[in-house]
Amino acid sequence: MLNIYNTDLKTNKFEKIKEFKPGSWISLVNPTEEEIKLVCSNLNIEDEFIKYPLDYEEQARIDVEDDMTLFVIDVPVIEEDKEGKSYSTMPLGLIVVRDEFFITVSLKKNRVIDSFEKGRVKGMYTYKKTRFVLQILYLNASFFLTDLKRINKNAENTVGILKKTMKNEELIQLLNLENSLVY
């Protein structure tokens, strides 16, 4: 999915737009090949920086090439199934192109980008690239801390139950919570 956002320089109003214009933010969530080609042709860039974060195993890193900077960070993901919640991470790419465009790339929707798209983050301007990167990093760290607190609380509750009953279910649940901390 391809969305383009811009903050108007005069009014500072954050809005969704249809065209690529300098100072805008391009959000790519599980993009198709056509969407990747559209972004690359309009911004006159190679597709490799866009494709790196689409690899679920991509490592967090910073890469600078010509007039582009790529930040790959891990964002926390909560998935629910019949056994409860599981915590993991996935890569999120932040790309600054010639200090004109800001691109975010992720495999699926996530809380970090969703917070910005829905206007929940105050003082966010698409044309202030460094500030935007720092705001994303700060919000991402906040989500990690929140999730770690939840995991710790669940682990403590499960340990308390284990002390009383020692059943396999609680032991498996505790092991699953401990495995979440690896991410």
Give the ranges of each region predicted by the language model.
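Peripheral, non-transmembrane regulatory/ligand-interaction domains of membrane transport proteins
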Residues: 1-183
